[in-house]
Each structure stands twice: as structure tokens, then as C-alpha cells.
Amino acid sequence: MIKCAEDFGIDWVTVMSDPWAEASAFGIQVEYPEDTLPVDTGGHLPDATAASVMEHYNPLKNSRCLNRLKEIEIFRKQAGDRFFIVGWVEGPVAEYVDLRKATNASVDFLMEPDIVEKAMDTIVECAMSFIHLQIKAGAHCIGIGDSFCSQIGPDLYFRFAFERQKKLVELIHSENVMAKLHICGNTESILEGMIKTGVDIIDIDHMVPSMDRFAASLASHQVFSGKSDPITVIQNGERSTIIQSVRSDFIAAKGRCIVSAGCEITPETTIENMKNFKSSVFELQKL
């Protein structure tokens, strides 16, 4: 990660992606094939009631969580203050989905919401402990990944996620570091809520049509991050396409935007296009 940041002029280093770390600490069995996505293979909770009474995990006794803490310590030791160090936790909705699987979780949200909320409170309490340890290890910022929120609509977002995300953000701020919120997919219907959590950096997925009408809602300490399409623009686009995408997003955000992909950049992206993405930043100076 440090080498990548050095080669391509990236301003931060991050412990993502390992979104299954906390799930494995809760007991989910996860396999990590070489050069592809992790696969959850067992250990899922049988029902919402089981989720609501699950025990808190100890990050210091789980290998994936310990790896994250060690990564941050290495970043701090080797990169010092050259790069912005971003730690990570899963948000309540995403983590619940990991524990129950997507279809089961979706039914739970509709049929047993009160029981689901008990489980999510446990998830948040565990995340708070993990956040504290990551900050102690040297993180400048903690990202919160709550990907499935884009699939549940505004009503359920505000019931399950908003206050809990806000609680995590407030904890992060109380320890004098920044907070970042990432929700995959088209978050247009919940974007005002994401902003109101008070988080410092709001990731914008490429599926969000535009940041234009939301820019005025940002507080003075807030910025967007995004949202060039990882496939059609960054992986497959010509240099001019990449520059135009970055320019359009920057203008739409009224200049309140970190230049970033609108979700994860693919392994198939060429070095040339990564360099084009980097150079697109300097084109903004011409605006």
C-alpha cells in the first residue's frame, strides 16, 4: 500500500479491503483465495434472535482484527506523517448482513426489526472498541463501511443505520481523528442522511447521478470523495475520458471533493491509466 501510494501520488494509505475481519471475529468462517474476493463458508447465525444475543468479540484475540492493528502500526512506523492513515470498521447494517447473509437479513429487517436492532447495538459496541484500538495504533481517520444501506431505502436506513453511524462518528471525533463513511451503490435517497451523520469524508459511488444538489448541505469540515466509474472510466477510459470525469465531479461538488474512484479500482486497471488518473488532479488547477 505504501509503495502504491508512492508510485501513484496517493495521499493516504488504508487497511481496506478486508471487510470480513469483524465477521470472522463474530464466528463466520471465511476463506481467502489468492487474487480474488473472500468467500464466507459457514458459521452464519441461524436467526435474528441468535444475532441479538451474540457475544462481544475481542479484537485482540482475532487474527484478522490483529492484522489490521499491525497494519496501522506499520503504516505509522514506515510512513510516519507522509500519508493519511485510514483505519476501518464495518457499519451495523453491513455487518448484520455478513452475519445472517443478505436474503435472511433482508427478511429480518422487515419481520423482526426490534430484534435486529439489539444485534446492531452489539455490532456498534464492538466496533467502538475496535475503533479505539485502531486510533491508539496510529490511525488518522476511521472509515465506516455500511455497503448494504443503499439496498434498504430511506425508512430502514434511518431506523437501523443513521443514529448508529452517527454514534460511531461522534466517538471517532471525540478521539480527535477524522471519520469517513462508505456506502456502495446509488445512495442518492439517503445522501442527506449520510451528510447529517457529521462524518468528515462522504464517499460517493459512481452510481450516484450527481453531487451537485447535495454540495450545499456540506458543513465546513465535510467533503465528498469520488466518483469516477472504476470500470468505464478508470479501467477502460482514454486519458481524456478520465480527465473529463474528474473535472465534472469536481465542478458538481463545488470543489468540495477528494479525487477518487466511485468504488474500488479493479486489478485489471493499467499502470498508464492509474497515472492518467493521478495527472487528472493537476488539470483541476486550470479551472
Residue ranges and their predicted role:
Residues 1-27:
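Glycine-rich, N-terminal phosphate-binding loop and its surrounding beta-alpha-beta segment
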Residues 4, 11, 36-37, 57-287:
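Active-site loop segments of alpha/beta catalytic cores
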Residues 19-60, 81-82:
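A contiguous, low-structure linker/loop signature
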